[in-house]
Every structure is written in C-alpha cells, then in structure tokens.
Design a protein with these regions (language model features):
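A short, polar/charged loop/turn motif at coil->beta-strand junctions and beta-hairpin connectors
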Residues: 7-10, 79, 161
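Residue-level detector of conserved, well-ordered beta-strand and adjacent loop positions
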Residues: 17, 155, 168
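Catalytic core of non-heme Fe(II) oxygenases with the double-stranded beta-helix
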Residues: 90-149, 161-165, 170-185
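A short beta-turn/loop motif at secondary-structure boundaries
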Residues: 86, 158-159
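Short, Lys/Arg- and Gly-enriched loop/turn segments at beta-strand edges
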Residues: 151-158
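Non-heme Fe(II)/2-oxoglutarate
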Residues: 1-74
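Conserved double-stranded beta-helix
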Residues: 51-52, 60-120
C-alpha cells in the first residue's frame, strides 16, 4: 500500500490513481466543453491557443470536497486556493515554469482527451530541472506536486483536445497561508453566466491586478 504522505514529503510529488471516478470526471469534462462552446473560456498568456476557465462551478465544488480527504492522505492541513481548467487544443505548448504562491500544493487531473494517447506532463525534481520525468495522467487520476518548487511543462500538443483540471491548495501552517481562497477572489461564479466578451474582460482585469498570471 502506497504511503502517499511519505512519498509526497520525500519526492515533493505523488501520483494518486482514481482520485475521481469516471462518471465524475466525465461530468466535469462536460462542464468545461459546454462552457467552451458557449464562448465562456478565455485565452491566457501562458497557453494562448487553448480555452481556460477560472473556478468553473462544478469543478470548484469538487475542489472544496477534496480538501479534507487530501489533508488526511498527505498529512498536511490544507485549505483550497482555486481551481483552473483548460481545454487544450492542437499546437499548444506549456513552457517550463513554477507556480505562484496560491499554487503552493497543486494537483493536475486529466478529465478527458481525444487523440492517440493522453498528453504527458514533464515534472522536474527541482525548480531548475530541465530534463524532468515524463508522466502520463489517466482520466480521473491525479498528480499532486509542490507547484512553487518543482518546474513542470508540456511539449507541443499533437492531439485533438485534452481537458485538464488543476486543483490548487495552500498549507495552513506554511508560508503562503494568506493565499487561501486565492486571496478571496470570488468573481468567477457569476462571470461564467455572462457572455464570452464580458468573461474575457473580467479575466483581463483580474490578471492585471496580480503580479503573475495563473500557472498550471
């Protein structure tokens, strides 16, 4: 039996299979595709080809529900920061980066994909690692990692689409405790109900008010 807490403490990352059952993953995947078709996604600076979503409602509900079980699994007193989803599209590249403070402890989960195989992520062993470990994340599986410490990236996407969900947490007893709930940013729940242009304008206003854009 895997000791997730020990592995996460030692390696600063851990792979958790079946974090969501397939039906739940499909439901969240459907939410992201529906929002995309309604024009409620945005193009961020990090992945301009793809459609991105800050705190989509059903995904955020899943994020909040994850806090208690993940806290027990990792033996860390977590609080949620925010969730972020991307519908990755052909030609996208995720450049090597580490994450901002609100992403101290992060998880990336594949919700669905269309292509020959799932699009892998490369996870470095520290913030300067340029080689990294190639990791294929199955649908409903979760890779947790210290986002502010480990450099991560994805090479050029050759598939048709892939839906990725990111859960971001902070350690209540750590250096970034003040970033709980992403410093209380809460506009997104209502923004997903307005037209696409208003969504994009709200997103631009939000990112301009921060020192950096979301990193995933």
């Amino acid at each position: 039996m895997t000791d997730y807490a020990a592995e996460f403490k030692t390696k600063r990352m851990v792979y958790i299979p079946d974090a969501l059952d397939i039906n739940s993953a499909n439901e969240l995947n459907d939410e992201i595709h529906s929002l995309s078709m309604e024009g409620k996604g945005t193009s961020d600076e990090q992945c301009p080809i793809s459609h991105s979503f800050y705190n989509p409602p059903k995904c955020k509900q899943a994020l909040v529900k994850m806090v208690e079980p993940l806290s027990k699994l990792l033996n860390i007193d977590l609080d949620y920061s925010y969730c972020y989803a991307r519908l990755y599209l052909p030609g996208e590249v995720l450049k090597p980066h580490i994450d901002r403070e609100s992403c101290e402890i992060s998880a990336t989960m594949t919700l669905g994909y269309y292509g020959p195989d799932v699009w892998p992520i490369y996870m470095g062993e520290h913030n300067m690692d340029t080689k990294g470990n190639k990791i294929n994340i199955g649908i409903g599986d979760m890779l947790m990692y210290h986002g502010t410490e480990l450099r991560h990236w994805r090479e050029k996407f050759e598939g048709v689409w892939q839906t990725q969900l990111f859960f971001h947490f902070i350690d209540k007893n750590g250096p970034y405790a003040e970033h709980a709930q992403d410093k209380k940013v809460v506009w997104s729940e209502e923004s997903v109900e307005v037209d696409g242009e208003d969504y994009r304008q709200k997103w631009k206003q939000l990112t301009k008010s921060r020192t950096s854009t979301p990193n995933n």
